[in-house]
Regions:
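N-terminal beta-alpha supersecondary unit
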Residues: 1-64
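Surface "functional belts" at beta-alpha junctions
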Residues: 22, 34, 89-197, 226, ...
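Residues at secondary-structure transition points
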Residues: 30-38, 69, 73, 77, ...
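Structured loop/turn residues at beta-strand edges in well-structured enzyme cores
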Residues: 52-55, 110, 222
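DPxDG-like acidic metal-binding loop motif
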Residues: 59-95
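Glycine-rich phosphate-binding/hydrolytic loop that grips phosphoryl groups
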Residues: 190-228, 232
Length: 238
């Protein structure tokens, strides 16, 4: 079973192609803008490198946010075009889930009591979510300022708990979080990488897609998760 995974939710574009759960093609390019012009050539080159044709794909997965308004729509449009033209399912994966799964599956990193994920928004508020070691959300996904993130974290942090900060905006809150956990002794660990399409391969949603051997037709099972209102809206008709 072959699949293509796509992300352009933040300051990068990435594409991953898999065959029977094995990665056969992967491209990742950092970029602050130009996602719309980069994504299709990247998809084509990744498929070519993986020796995979569009008609061989069985499903498409794409990150569904939170992230850049434009970036999320760019990757969704590309993913939807592939799914529709090949009559295959389209699935969405949360950026928080992708990062959390990447961290969890990295055997070089020790397990921590808390995982604080912080994603860049290019605005004053950052996208944040915090999970305990069982994966339960203890700060639900939302957009908060650095001071509000620190306040919420301090209210739930228990002395002695180990912490990992992950996500491309993790570096922005290090100082505030360090002050909270410093009296307790243990240092936090870091994984300040943004989302990569490759991270989708570590999620439980991705692995669940292989449970069915039947060829499925086009389905659209996702909504983009922006976590905040757009900066520009259509004026109301008076």
């Amino acid at each position: 079973m072959k699949a293509i995974l796509i992300d352009s939710s933040a300051s990068a574009c990435s594409v991953c192609v898999t065959t029977d759960k094995v990665v056969t093609g992967h491209n990742y390019v950092s970029m602050d803008r130009g996602h719309a012009s980069a994504i299709v050539p990247m998809i084509e080159s990744t498929l070519k490198g993986a020796k995979t044709l569009f008609e061989e794909l069985r499903f498409v997965a794409v990150t569904k946010g939170p992230g850049s308004f434009t970036g999320l729509r760019v990757s969704l449009a590309a993913a939807k075009a592939i799914a529709l033209s090949n009559n295959i399912p389209l699935f969405g994966v949360s950026c928080f889930d992708a990062i959390a799964s990447r961290v969890k599956n990295n055997r070089n990193l020790p397990v921590t009591d808390l995982l604080l994920i912080v994603i860049e928004s290019k605005r004053k508020e950052l996208y944040v979510e915090c999970r305990d070691k069982s994966g339960t959300e203890i700060i639900e996904s939302q957009a908060l300022s650095i001071s509000d993130i620190a306040g919420r974290f301090e209210s739930l942090y228990q002395p002695g708990e180990s912490v990992r900060i992950a996500g491309d905006a993790g570096g922005l809150i290090v100082e505030a979080i360090a002050e909270i956990i410093k009296p307790s002794g243990p240092a936090f660990t870091e994984d300040f990488s943004g989302v990569d399409a490759f991270d989708i391969t570590t999620t439980k949603e991705y692995w669940a897609l292989f449970n069915s051997t039947a060829k499925l037709g086009y389905t659209y099972q996702m909504d983009l998760n922006y976590l905040r209102k757009p900066d520009v809206s259509i004026p109301k008709i008076r």
